[in-house]
Structures are given as structure tokens and as C-alpha cells.
From Swiss-Prot:
Belongs to the OCC1 family. Residues 1-13, 48-61 have a biased composition (Polar residues). Residues 1-61 are annotated as: Disordered. It comes from Danio rerio (Zebrafish). This is Overexpressed in colon carcinoma 1 protein homolog.
Length: 61
């Protein structure tokens, strides 16, 4: 009995999870690109360079 339930349970959520993952990926991309009231949500590549520059300046002093 236990094996039958395990097999059925594993088969059912598989496809549902795959579809869910695809939707989540799209939603995440949209969330990153969205503009909330003029505030950009995301991490631009330039910001990484600025952070590195600030760290270097702080390290210098």
C-alpha cells in the first residue's frame, strides 16, 4: 500500500512543480525589471563596480 501511494504522489506533483517553476522564473524576472514609483528594483552591473571602488577607498584609509 505504501509504495502505491508514494508512486502516485511522486507522479502527480512532478508536472505541477515544473509548470510552477516556469511561472516563478517569469515572475522573478518581471519583479527584477519592475519600476516601483521611480525606484529601480534590481542590481545593475555598475553598482557592483561602485561598491568595489568604495571598498578599495575604505581599505586605503
Amino acid at each position: 500500500m505504501g509504495c502505491g501511494n508514494s508512486t502516485a504522489a511522486s507522479t502527480t506533483p512532478g508536472p505541477a512543480e515544473s509548470a510552477k517553476d516556469v511561472q516563478d522564473d517569469s515572475s522573478m524576472d518581471e519583479e527584477k525589471r519592475r519600476n516601483y514609483g521611480g525606484v529601480y528594483v534590481g542590481i545593475p552591473a555598475d553598482l557592483t563596480n561602485e561598491t568595489a571602488g568604495q571598498t578599495a577607498s575604505t581599505h586605503k584609509e
